[in-house]
Amino acid sequence: RLLPVLHKLDIPIVYYISPQLWAWRAGRLKTLKKYVSKMLVIFPFEEAIYADAGVPVEFVGHPLIDLAVATRSRGETCRAAGLDPDRPVVALLPGSRPNELRLLLPTLVESAMRVAREVPGVQFLVARAPALDDELFASLQVLQTAGLTMAVLDGKTDDVLEAADVVITASGTATVQTALHHRPMVIVYRVSPVT
């Protein structure tokens, strides 16, 4: 709705981080071509899509690439969290939004309990987004009361990923972070029943 208004006012429009039209609505290309002065894309394959459609485009890279750096080694992170670096570590990344956490945390807890039954000595390391409150994490106590070894690190996702052997993560930015750390992952996503 805003694009036509800005275009009519002759205001140049630079669009940073392309809509995922390659996965959803390819028809949006016509709208973007009509109104956008330049697309700044973060994935290399997007550049060709826009160029082929005649949309001015520049590949600028993904903002996480330079940021995905752990501040501690696996051993340092495990020791700081009270875990044994010589035992398997599964990272749990439940997401950063309260609603996402409410929908996914029960599934992550159930998954962790299943993994623990199959993998002797496994430990769980949870990356917690700093803005999330304690009440939302209360269900994680189930893991500790079930005798599982678990620790939570606030705002240290890259350290958690560096320490992990495998990751169970919410779909989204964390999947890109996990890939940048070259960790195998299981991606979870749950939609509302209305969807």
Say what each PLM segment does.
Residues 154-195:
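A donor-sugar binding/catalytic signature common to diverse glycosyltransferases
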Residues 97-127:
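Conserved catalytic-core segment of nucleotide-activated headgroup transferases in glycan assembly
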Residues 1-78, 93-101, 121, 129-131, ...:
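Active-site and donor-binding regions of nucleotide-sugar-utilizing enzymes
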Residues 37, 88, 165:
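Conserved acidic residues
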Residues 84-91, 122-123:
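Charged active-site motifs of nucleotide-sugar-dependent glycosyltransferases
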